A protein has these predicted regions:
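Conserved phosphate/ATP/ADP-binding segment of small-molecule kinases
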Residues: 191-283
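Active-site metal-binding loops of divalent metal-dependent hydrolases
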Residues: 23, 185, 305
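Conserved post-catalytic alpha-helical subdomain immediately downstream of the catalytic base
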Residues: 290-356, 360
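Conserved N-terminal subdomain of the carbohydrate kinase-like
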Residues: 66-154, 181, 350-362
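Glycine-rich phosphate/adenosyl-contacting loop at the front of the ribokinase-like
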Residues: 2-92, 113-116, 133-135, 290, ...
Length: 362
């Protein structure tokens, strides 16, 4: 397979990937219990950017994760978990109690849905170590040296002002150094407002090559008169090909730096059965994936698995239709894996699903 990607304009073989975000302790009541019923919790680790680094590392991509965690048993355990999945953690910052006003690991509680009952997430991540750290101490030029691909999301800047500054600075440095940049808006209503998210994420767009999702961004019909609305206003969550193609075209007209835009579409039949498909703009065309239907063991991290699948396929220069189908198949498989991350080192299992091959492998 050729590894020069003419759209990205670079050799993709052996590329080094880095991402930045908060890794959290995840606490889940067992056996689909509601939080109010729980007397014990299953503990694991997760977070959008960490999930993507871990998924790519399991598929053989050289992946590094940058974050700030407390220098205590919880922080060290999170780092060990990443390293056990082949994620490089050399740039990770472990803070001492006297280094930041707060020295704690962010936490979230997951109440896993079942049937008609949806899942529920409660965050406890205010004043975590990453939100209190002074990132002016970090030499971002040195941090990104030697890497080829940077992935960021709209979750980390929602945490605190210092994180917003970090993300913008990383985007600028990455652009200057010629890294491929992917960005997922990943709006979290419990972390900031819709308007805050739209303002910030739109500011990021000029630095992005690969855009995941079409929200939360401003795409005004008239920059001087916002009363005329956003091009995305009124577009359904489950758009037709024509509706999605039109939105992609408006993005490309406004931001010609974008080389790929992809978004997945979910059809929720119940809390335990969903279908997924995706649309992607790439090389001047809009592509629509197959529709995948599956039962859900753990929905958390499905979007991250979609992102990691797309990045993997781009790094391996898949054809466009294979690229988007591989991304959706990666997300579908994640829904069958317990925990935040798509922990599979078997590319063939994703490709088999992509090609709708369910035979038992003997």
């Amino acid at each position: 397979m050729e590894h020069f990607n003419p759209i990205l304009g670079k050799e993709t073989a052996g590329q080094k990937f880095i991402t930045c975000g908060e890794i959290m302790l995840r606490l889940t009541p067992p056996n689909y219990e509601k939080l109010r019923m729980a007397s014990n919790f299953e503990a694991s680790y997760g977070g959008s950017e960490a999930n993507i680094a871990l998924a790519l590392a399991n598929l053989g991509v050289d992946s590094t994760f940058f974050s700030v965690v407390p220098n205590n048993s919880l922080g060290k355990s999170a780092v060990r978990w990443l390293r056990s999945n082949d994620v490089h953690c050399t740039p990770m910052i472990l803070t001492e109690p006297n280094e930041t006003p707060s020295n704690r690991l962010g936490t979230y509680y997951l109440e896993t849905g079942y049937g008609i009952r949806p899942s529920k997430v409660i965050y406890d991540r205010k004043h975590s170590a990453i939100t209190e750290y002074d990132f002016s101490q970090v030499d971002l030029d040195a941090l990104l040296e030697g890497f080829d691909w940077l992935h960021l999301s709209g979750i980390t800047p929602a945490l605190a002002p210092n994180c917003r500054g970090l993300i913008i600075d990383m985007l600028k440095v990455a652009k200057k150094k010629g890294l491929t940049v992917s960005f997922d808006g990943n709006f979290r209503s419990t972390l900031w407002t819709w308007d805050e998210a739209r303002d910030f994420c739109t500011e990021c767009l000029p630095y992005v090559d690969v855009l995941l999702g079409i929200e939360p961004y401003h795409l005004w019909k008239d920059e001087n008169d916002h009363s005329k609305g956003d091009w995305k206003d009124g577009v359904p969550l489950q758009p037709s090909y024509e509706q999605q193609d039109e939105i992609f075209q408006h993005f490309i007209e406004r931001y010609p730096n974008l080389k790929c835009i992809a978004r997945h579409v979910r059809y929720a039949h119940s809390g335990s059965e969903n279908s997924l498909k995706a649309f992607m703009w790439y090389d001047g065309h809009t592509f629509e994936s197959k529709l995948f239907t599956f039962n859900i063991l753990d929905r958390v991290g499905g979007g991250d698995a979609f992102a990691s699948g797309l990045i993997y396929a781009m790094l391996h220069n898949y054809r466009a239709m294979d690229m988007i189908n591989f991304a959706v198949a990666s997300s579908a498989i994640k829904h069958t894996i317990h925990g935040d991350a798509n922990i599979t080192d078997d590319v063939s299992s994703i490709r088999n699903l992509m090609n709708m091959n369910y035979d038992i492998k003997r």
